[in-house]
Amino acid sequence: MKKLNIIFAGTPDISAQVLKDLYKSQHNIQAVLTQPDRAKGRGKKVQFSPVKEVALANHTPVFQPLSFKKNPEVLEQIKQLKPDVIVVIAYGIIVPQEFLDIARYGCLNIHVSLLPKWRGAAPIQRAIQAGDTKTGICIMQMDAGLDTGDILNTLEIEIQETDTSQTLHDKFAKLSIKPLLETLEKIEIIKPEPQQGEPSYAHKITKQEGLIDFTKSAWQISCHIRAFTPWPGAYFILDDEAIKVGEFEILYQNTDNRKAGTIIDIDRSGFDIATSDKIIRFRQLQFPNKKMLNIVDILNGKDLDKYIGYKLG
C-alpha cells in the first residue's frame, strides 16, 4: 500500500478513534484540524477536543480556525503541506471549495449512514428513531453540497433492537477505519459512484424532542428512547416535572383499551405505562436533580402509588 500524506479534520470522540487507528497505519498524518478549544463546566475550564488530545499525544501540528473566513491563513498553511488527501469525520466547521481542492485526491468524508439516506447532522439518531434495521459507513468524495458527494466505499451495519445511539456510535467508531483504509489503498484506481435513491435528511437533534408520545406504538416508543440515549434523553412529564427514562421493556400483552399514557401499575418490577398497543415497563427513572435509579431504589424513598391510573399528557 502506498504511503499517503494526510490532513485529518474532526472533533468529537468518534473522530478521535478513527485518528488513533489511522496513526497505526503506514500513512503520514501531516496535520490535524479540529474545532477551537471550549470553556466547559462550572469552572469554565478550557478543554481540548478529543481529536486535539490524540494529535498532541502523537506530536502532530494542530490547526483550530474559528472559520476559514475568519482564519484564511490556515488554508495557506495547509496548501504548503501539499497533502495527498484530506480525511474528514464530524469536523463541525463548514469548509469552502478552496479547501476541497487542496489535496491531490481531494477530501474524503466518513459519513455514518447509507447515503443518500440520512444526510446531515444526526444520522445515527434518526436511523434508530425511524426503526431502520440497517445502516452503514460511507466513504464519500466531498463536494459543495450537504453529504451529496460520490461514494467510494461502503460498509453495511445491522441495527440491533437493543442498539442505542451510544452503542451504534461506538460501533461506527470501531469500524470506520476498515472502509477508510480500503479506500486509501485503492485511491488511485477507485471509481466514484453517484449516490442512488431518494435522499432523506437527519436534522439536528433538539432537547425538546426527547418527550415521549405514548399515543404511538410500543415499538415506536422503543425506537424513540434508544435514539435519544444518551442525549438528550427520553422523558415524560409528571406533575410538571421531566422524568427521564432508562432501562425498559415492552410487555407483550393487550392494554385492555386503557388509554395511551395511562400509568397502569407501579411496583418493584417497574413503572408500567400504556401505549397505543402494549404496555411499556420502565425499570429505571431519573427525577430532576437526581441520578438515574432502579425503580426498586426509587420506591424505597418515594411513594408513587398515587399515580396509578393517572394519565400522562
From Swiss-Prot:
Question: InterPro entries per the record?
Answer: Fmt, Formyl_trans_C, Formyl_trans_C_sf, Formyl_transf_N, Formyl_transf_N_sf, Formyl_transferase-like_C_sf, GART_AS, Met-tRNA-FMT_C
MF (Gene Ontology)? methionyl-tRNA formyltransferase activity
Keywords, A to Z, come to: Protein biosynthesis, Transferase
Q: Under which EC number(s) is this enzyme classified?
A: 2.1.2.9
Residues bound to (6S)-5,6,7,8-tetrahydrofolate are: 113-116
Q: What is the catalytic activity of this protein? A: L-methionyl-tRNA(fMet) + (6R)-10-formyltetrahydrofolate = N-formyl-L-methionyl-tRNA(fMet) + (6S)-5,6,7,8-tetrahydrofolate + H(+)
Class in the EC hierarchy, top level: transferase
Cystine bridges: none
Taxonomy, superkingdom: Bacteria
A cellular component annotation (GO) from this entry = cytosol
Q: Which Pfam families match?
A: Formyl_trans_C (PF02911), Formyl_trans_N (PF00551)
HAMAP family for this protein: Formyl_trans
Q: What does this protein do?
A: Attaches a formyl group to the free amino group of methionyl-tRNA(fMet). The formyl group appears to play a dual role in the initiator identity of N-formylmethionyl-tRNA by promoting its recognition by IF2 and preventing the misappropriation of this tRNA by the elongation apparatus.
Sequence similarity: Belongs to the Fmt family.
Write down what this protein is called.
Methionyl-tRNA formyltransferase
Q: Encoded by which gene?
A: fmt
